[in-house]
Amino acid sequence: MEEVKVYIDCLDGDNRGDLVRCSDCGELMLIQIGGTACGECESKNLQWYDDNRPEWTIPELEEAGFIIIEK
């Protein structure tokens, strides 16, 4: 199982956000929809975790087996 850092305060009302990985530090995170910077290193070099499904909710992440780390 992989850890996902979830930036709760940045998500929309239904806890939906963009699931991205930073190409510089490797961090996997759920950030605000349309976010452009890594929450760890502030790099703007982000890539979708899944090109076919950029937006996820916290329950969807849990159902997929991810470990949620709230930030």
Model regions: which residues?
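Cys/His-rich microdomains that often coordinate metals
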Residues: 29, 45
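Short, intrinsically disordered terminal segments enriched in charged and Pro/Gly residues
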Residues: 1-18, 47-71
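Short, flexible, glycine/charge-rich loop motifs used to bind or transfer phosphoryl groups or to couple energy/partner
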Residues: 11, 27-28
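Residues immediately within or flanking Cys/His clusters that coordinate Zn2+
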Residues: 17-19, 35-38
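Short cysteine-rich clusters marking metal-coordination/redox-active sites
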Residues: 22-25, 38-41
